Amino acid sequence: MVEGDFVDEQSNIALLSSKSMCGDHHSVKNSIGDEIFKLLTKILNSDEKASGDVHTLVSGTPDLSNFNLDNEPLENILAVFIISFIIVVVGVLLLGLIGMIFISLRSGSSNDKKLQSNDEEKQALAEKA
């Protein structure tokens, strides 16, 4: 058995198992695991091409055709940007809320000290009078 045949068998088994898990319900968006699986099988099936691609990427040539961004559905890219934006906005809002609570606690304790000193001054003035 040639090594390529073994890789083909393994990729076919994994593909059949992923199809059986999904059933006949195929959505427009592919999961990240499916994309990683496709990339790994592509690398395993073409050893020479993969090693050449790695060599060109390491040597620093700007060959972006290896990443296949033109085949990526636009919905997936937009979904990633939208989710990232939502995470950033929620994080900033939470940090702002925590900051406001911290500032209000600090100012509240300093206001109590000011009120207490004002009361003591009033009592001292009242006792003198």
From Swiss-Prot:
Keyword Cytoplasm tagged: no
Misc. comment: Present with 922 molecules/cell in log phase SD medium.
Location of this chain's protein in the cell: Vacuole membrane
Induction comment: By the genotoxic agents methyl methanesulfonate (MMS), bleomycin and cisplatin.
Compositional bias segments (type: Basic and acidic residues): 111-129
Protein name: Uncharacterized vacuolar protein YLR297W
Recorded topology in the membrane: Single-pass membrane protein
Keywords noted in UniProt: Membrane, Transmembrane, Transmembrane helix, Vacuole
Species of provenance: Saccharomyces cerevisiae (strain ATCC 204508 / S288c)
Record flagged with keyword Membrane: yes
Gene Ontology CC annotations of this record: cytoplasm; fungal-type vacuole; fungal-type vacuole membrane; nucleus
UniProt main location, coarse: membrane
TM helices/strands, residue ranges: 77-97
Record region (Disordered): 109-129
